[in-house]
């Protein structure tokens, strides 16, 4: 993700409620699980997507802690 995309993503997150953030986090965790499974099976083409999803989850957790 480019810096502009990251800023847009974080701004979007800040507009969400706690429940919506939790839902988005769960979706990304499921995607991360699927990506890890594909990587273990040797079927993953976009290996950079793993790190991107991890960082998005961390951004969500950061916004959640800001709200609290």
Curated annotation (Swiss-Prot):
Keywords: Ribonucleoprotein, Ribosomal protein
Coiled-coil annotated residue ranges, if any: none
One GO process term, biological-process aspect: translation
Keyword Ribosomal protein (UniProt): yes
Signal sequence, renumbered to the chain: none
Gene3D superfamilies noted in UniProt: 1.10.287.310
Gene Ontology terms for molecular function: structural constituent of ribosome
HAMAP family reported in the protein's UniProt record: Ribosomal_uL29
Record family assignment: Belongs to the universal ribosomal protein uL29 family.
Protein name per the record: Large ribosomal subunit protein uL29
Organism: Streptococcus thermophilus (strain ATCC BAA-250 / LMG 18311)
